[in-house]
């Protein structure tokens, strides 16, 4: 069955290590779109961290979408308006912020516009996230946070060895209550239980009237597994972690070797 929707992760997949898109990948995406295929960037980033890439790819037209916050938000690409949203509550935030201190990890939380930290010793990785995602960073003590805030995701962030120790201390019931997954060796993302990239892709596919077997999803990290499993054609990058390769139908080339372009040429353009 012909592919009608391509869901592409950004960091480690679409993007080179310097956060740019290669000419070959741009050309392959443009060629797929010229054939009427929907292409959607599917990322843990907020809209602010996606918008410039949408412009670069000419993917901010009416009928273009993006999936942000690992599936918590499906948005119209042109203006960021909401198509579907599932957020964590203030009570979730307070519980998880306290848990982060108990397990020994730095912590931050994101709503649609802002990255919040209650850590006075702000983590390097929090600053890094603010810079890469181009989202303002605000210090706010947990008890002073507006209880009406809708948190699209919260994150435990730390040096990989410290973070892995913290993850090992998280009670199993917490891992069952929320979606808990790694997006990088130094990022653990925690979302509403109903949220992952797979449910985000499904929400958009339902809007567009596209079946799972008409979808190709491409990724490299643990947070990409759900959409790779959901899609009819699940593609792992050659630089993907082993668990992603295990669930994929195909392993393409690495992001340094235009792996996204190679997969699009194989499954869409041929």
From Swiss-Prot:
Signal peptide: none annotated. CDD domains: HAD_Pase. Its EC number is 3.1.3.23. It is an enzyme of class 3 (hydrolase). One of its GO terms (molecular function) is sugar-phosphatase activity. The keyword Metal-binding applies. The active site is at 9 (nucleophile). Keywords: Hydrolase, Magnesium, Metal-binding. Magnesium. Can also use other divalent metal cations as manganese, cobalt or zinc. GO terms for cellular component: cytosol. It comes from the Bacteria. The keyword Metal-binding applies. Changing residue 9 to A: Loss of the phosphatase activity. Phosphate binds at residues 10, 43-44, 197, 223. Its cofactor is Mg(2+); Mn(2+); Co(2+); Zn(2+). Homodimer. Catalyzes the dephosphorylation of different sugar phosphates including erythrose-4-phosphate (Ery4P), ribose-5-phosphate (Ribu5P), fructose-1-phosphate (Fru1P), fructose-6-phosphate (Fru6P), glucose-6-P (Glu6P), and also imidodiphosphate (Imido-di-P) and acetyl phosphate (Acetyl-P). Selectively hydrolyzes alpha-D-glucose-1-phosphate (Glu1P) and has no activity with the beta form. This is Sugar phosphatase YidA. It comes from Escherichia coli (strain K12).
